[in-house]
Amino acid sequence: MKMFNFLTKTTLCLVVSTALLTMSADAQKTQKLTDPEIASVAVTANQIDIDYAAIAQKKSKNAEVLKFAATMAKDHQAVIDQAVALVTKLKVTPKTNATTKSFLAGATKTKAMLNAKSGKAFDKAYVDNEVAYHKAAINEVETVLIPQSSNSELKSLLQSAVPLFKAHLAHAQMVQKNLK
């Protein structure tokens, strides 16, 4: 019974994370994002992962999970810093939109779920979420944000982030495998 509850909760975590980004991708197929909206999506998605990492840094006792969370916080902050520098240079203000609102709503649920867990169950839920989140984020960047961006510098920033996100996914999958 404990294994069933554990698997059910882990599955819920993955569903919430994947649904968050899938819903936004589906919504954006019918509505083109502007560059200020794309900047908002990029900053929001990166900040959400920093928030997840902060939870992991407070709750986890696993050295590998803690190291991964520190990497997520550092790398995603660097992407935000690059995005902020670019929008400042371009004199563009990121614009909140349906996608950013959807991300934030999903993140609220995921953070509550993560905060409700502890020990090995937390570590597994956090890392499983990171795998799902990075898969969905890579898809969102490649299929929505890059194709819809008009500004070449914004497009270039997004393209340069994809290899980093793919490295994060590989790292998360490695940690996930080691937790089993």
Language model features: what each stretch is:
Residues 2-14, 19-180:
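His/Met- and acidic-residue-enriched segments that coordinate or traffic transition-metal cofactors
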